[in-house]
Amino acid sequence: METMDRKEFLSLLGIGSAALALTYCFGGCQPGNNGPTAPTNVDFTLDLTNSTNSALNSNGGYLYHNGVIVAKTVNGSFVAVSQYCTHAGGTVVYSPNVNDFYCPVHGSVFSTGGSVINGPAPSPLVKYNTSLTGTSLRVYS
């Protein structure tokens, strides 16, 4: 049976530790979202007379509901997109002064249609349909 001296042992230990560290470093560099994902099969209705939804009674107002941000744009139309930034999963906010969505985590900017205006977000926000009937706003996939 062959024995290992101290120098050889420490050398192999160092190589093994370096390989393990590199695996973790490069594993963390893989593209993709580490945060929550956009909701699928969305279908809900908001009663605009309910005080919980009062933010949508004013142009520039917005609210979050089940992973979706619903906003009433500065021109009075309703838009709905996933509330989670596609870069790191931060919660986006509606910016009425520039009529877009903004992620405060790393600065990504999205149009009201969800497309990326300014990264680092790699892909658009999922956009949902909206339909207003009287005082009921339906948001759906």
Tell where the protein language model's regions lie, with residue ranges.
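Short cysteine/histidine-rich metal-coordination sites, predominantly Zn2+-binding motifs
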Residues: 99-106, 117-125
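Flexible cofactor-recognition loop at the NAD(P)H-binding site
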Residues: 15, 90, 108
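N-terminal pre-ligand scaffold of iron-sulfur
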Residues: 31-97, 126-141
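Iron-sulfur (Fe-S) cluster-binding segments and ferredoxin-like electron-carrier domains
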Residues: 94-95, 108-115
